[in-house]
Amino acid sequence: TPSQCTAAQANKCCTGLTNGILNLNVLPALNP
């Protein structure tokens, strides 16, 4: 159903944003 598709897209987007934030927080720590 469209609602499930929307939920899947939202989850994918949310995961991408979370990974992006984690990368922004982790990468500077890895680069002295």
From Swiss-Prot:
Domain of life: Eukaryota
GO terms, molecular function: IgE binding; IgG binding
Keywords linked to the UniProt accession: Allergen, IgE-binding protein, IgG-binding protein
SS bonds (residue pairs): none
Name of the molecule in the record: Allergen Asp fl 1
